Every structure is written in structure tokens, then in C-alpha cells.
Amino acid sequence: MDKTLYTIIVHSENFAGLLNQVTAVFTRRQINIESLNVSASSIKGVHKYTITAWTDKDTIEKVTKQITKKIDVLQAHYFTDDEIYQHEIALYKITTPILEEKPEVSKIIRKYNARIVEVNPVFSIVEKNGMSEEITNLYEELSALECVLQFVRSGRVAITTSCFERVNEYLADREAKYRRSKEQEGL
């Protein structure tokens, strides 16, 4: 089966232990999570999980359905890279003496539109925002010059490229149902 990198976006209420429940769905199916980012969403009280994993379409559909069944999950959807806009951030700690001695290092940093955010006599810190591939390529080119001391990257953050936000519609529908039930109780 062909494996594709899928991004699952989960919206949930903010309850302790839910992250463990969500990751357990992947563990039970022996699917490795490539990146995981959890943060507050644009809706108060709702958190957004952005999870990436390599798998096939049938498996990602099953995983998404299992996650959706969790009590505190409002909704979960999976996407391919052409259905989302995604970004990461990376920090590269490089040796300042090599940065000063080899002009290629500065050229590579400029080529990838990265920026130097800290410089001292021992090391410099380079920051790169962008697509996963660009971040990896910059790392590989800097590593080839033997100047990388440390490297760290964030998990993927993503938004859908569709014209609507599914969670907003879901919450509006949920609120309308709640109000109707309250009105019926008042009758």
C-alpha cells in the first residue's frame, strides 16, 4: 500500500488526559506520529491538535473516526498537503567562527530566507519559518559545512485552504440544538 503524509486536525475541549487518548489511537495501530502540535484555537475553550503521520487512506479514515468518538473531541478531519497551508519553525545553533570564516554559510542562510537572531563569539542562532522540506534542506546544507551544533524544529501548524472553518459551523449547529432543547424544556 502507498503511504501518504496525512495531517489530522482535531478540535476538542481542553481536558487533561485527552492527548494521551488521542496518541493511544496511533499507538494501537502501530502508526508513528511524525509531528504533533497542540494549542488554543480561534474559538475560546477549544483546542486544536495538528498531527501528522504516514499511512494509507483506509487507515487514516479509521483513525480519524476513532478519534472523533472520544468524548471531549468536538471533531476530527484528515487532510493531504494539497488541502492545507502548513508551516514549521526551526532553530539552528551554528558555530560563529565557521559563520565568519566561510561565506557559503551566510549565502545558504540568505538563500533559504532564514535570519540570524543571535550572535556571540561562540555560536549564532538561525531561525527559519517555512515548509518542512525547506527546513530540512537548510539543515542538510548547513550540516555539510560542519557548522551545526544543535537543531530543533516545531511540529506542523496548519489551516485548511477551504473557504470555511468546519469547527465554527459545528459549534454553531451544536449551540442551535442546545437552545432548541432548552426552549422545549421550557414549554
What function would you assign to each model-found segment?
Residues 1-48, 57-187:
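Long, contiguous binding/interaction regions
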